[in-house]
Each structure stands twice: as C-alpha cells, then as structure tokens.
Amino acid sequence: MVIFFESIKINKVSIETEIIDSFSEKGVQLASGKLIEADIIVTATGIKLQNFGGIRIFVDDHEVDVSKSFIYKSMMYTQIPNFINTFGYINASWTLKADLTSKYACRLINFMKDNNYAKCLPEAPEGLEETKGFLDDFSSGYVRRAASITVRQGNKKPWVNNQNYLKDIFEINYGKIEDNSLRFS
C-alpha cells in the first residue's frame, strides 16, 4: 500500500474519473479523447445509485417520481409530505450536514406539534427554474449516470443544494420554520 501512495506522490500513478471509450494495446482511450498509456488498469465501475436505497415512495397510492421534485433546504422534497432525507456535503464532512438536518427535523417536528399540524409539504413557487442537477458538483461517473433520476434544485433559496456549511448554519439552524415554501395542515 505504501508503494502505491509513494508512486502517486512522485507522479508515477494517475487517477482519472472519466468514461472509458475503449482499451488498446497502448492503454485506455477515454471518451474525452485522452489516451492514457498504462501497464495496469483498475476500473471502478458498476455502482448504480438508487434514490432512498431503492425504496419506492407512494403518496395517495401514486408513486412519486423524485426526478420531477425540487429539493427544499437540501433535505425535503416537493410531492412528498412529512419526509426529510439526509444528504451530506461533498466538500466537507458528511456528518456536518447530517447534524444540521437532524436539528432542523427536530425543530420542524416541535413546530408542527406546538401548532397541531399533521402534515408539512414543500411547494415550489411558480416559475422556479432548475439551475443544475442536485448532484452536478460530483465528478464520479456513477454519480453522473444517476443524474436523470435524482431530485432537482432551483435557482434561489431555499431550493438550492448548498455545499457551504457556514451558509447552511444560518439558513437551517436559525432560519424560520414557517416560510412561504412550506404548507402546513
């Protein structure tokens, strides 16, 4: 294992995240056109992402197509009431976002209990535009292949998947629970 890391340190090894177009006697031809000459090739393909581990979600006997939903505060989905999903940061510790999400969930549950609400549903405003996919900041091939099945994000708060802990602290920990985007009943 030490030899591998030493080889990386002195630039004898390269790691590429790219679609393989073909193999040849010289190495690997990537879809981008780049040829990587190689003695050994280790592929890391085959992972297929699923929403919620493959669990199908139904609301009022209709299956929800998550790819048609918008994300709210990086944790709730339009079309799915009373549902919070934890999705961490790609550029920092995963648990930082998980902690914020858990705290928000507790605040939301307490707010609903205090106000005798049984249901909470994020509703995207008319004209909300999708700016990029929820996972566009990930470069891994298996993540990019799943882009068509994942939730969408909008062009303004709270419909953006922030990858910034400091922004999220204020928006999630200290922002109002009751806003123009959540519908309670």
Question: How would you name each of these model-derived features?
Answer:
Residues 1-111, 178-185:
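Flavin (primarily FAD) cofactor-binding/catalytic cores of flavoenzymes
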Residues 71, 82-185:
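C-terminal, flexible cofactor-proximal segment of oxidoreductases
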